[in-house]
Amino acid sequence: MKIGIMSDTHDHLPNIRKAIEIFNDENVETVIHCGDFVSLFVIKEFENLNANIIATYGNNDGERCKLKEWLKDINEENIIDDFISVEIDDLKFFITHGHHQSVLEMAIKSGLYDVVIYGHTHERVFEEVDDVLVINPGECCGYLTGIPTIGILDTEKKEYREIVLE
């Protein structure tokens, strides 16, 4: 299964549209968004996504109840929470925005997860720590680093591919 991974979209509509187009072209079945959508209006863009969404709230996401409601309106299978533990293709995932550093570190060290995915720092990370894949897709918006990125994880091969949005 292919999983699209993104974070820190920060209202950047052109890059959100590019990411959705890539995810649709790649036939991803699920998109993980690690938070910081920021404004509610960006959720409407995800109506064009041909996959369900697993998302976390970021520290810049305000209207949490409405955010959850709007995501559910797009697809009843969409979920959003502060921390998510989910199994996909026999892999155990922990997903968070990443602004609670101690929680992130505990998840990585716990031995409970195969994959830990987070955002918040806007810095790209792909590493293996004690048999745990640790992924930060960087920032979709490109505001801090100047390099807008998303990623695709192939769960069968356990391979991650970074994509720079141009």
From Swiss-Prot:
InterPro entries: Calcineurin-like_PHP_lpxH, Metallo-depent_PP-like, MetalloPDE_YfcE-like, MPP_YfcE, PdiEstase_YfcE_CS, Phosphodiesterase_MJ0936/Vps29
Binding sites annotated in the UniProt record for Ni(2+) 1: 8, 10, 36, 122
Binding sites annotated in the UniProt record for Mn(2+) 1: 8, 10, 36, 122
Cofactor detail note: Binds 2 divalent metal ions per subunit. Most effective are nickel and manganese.
Keyword tags: Hydrolase, Manganese, Metal-binding, Nickel
Record: residues binding Mn(2+) 2: 36, 59, 97, 120
Cofactor needs: Ni(2+); Mn(2+)
Pfam hit, one: Metallophos_2
SUPFAM superfamilies: Metallo-dependent phosphatases
Top-level enzyme category: hydrolase
Activation/inhibition comment: Competitively inhibited by phosphate.
Activity-pH behavior: Optimum pH is 9.4-9.8.
Single GO molecular function: hydrolase activity
Functional description taken from the UniProt entry: Shows phosphodiesterase activity. Hydrolyzes phosphodiesters bonds in the artificial chromogenic substrates bis-p-nitrophenyl phosphate (bis-pNPP), and less efficiently thymidine 5'-monophosphate p-nitrophenyl ester (pNP-TMP) and p-nitrophenylphosphorylcholine (pNPPC). No catalytic activity was found toward cAMP or cGMP, nucleotides or phospholipase substrates such as phosphatidylcholine. The physiological substrate is unknown.
Subunit structure as annotated in this protein's UniProt entry: Monomer.
Family that this chain belongs to: Belongs to the metallophosphoesterase superfamily. YfcE family.
PANTHER family (UniProt xref): METALLOPHOSPHOESTERASE, PHOSPHODIESTERASE MJ0936
The protein's name: Phosphodiesterase MJ0936
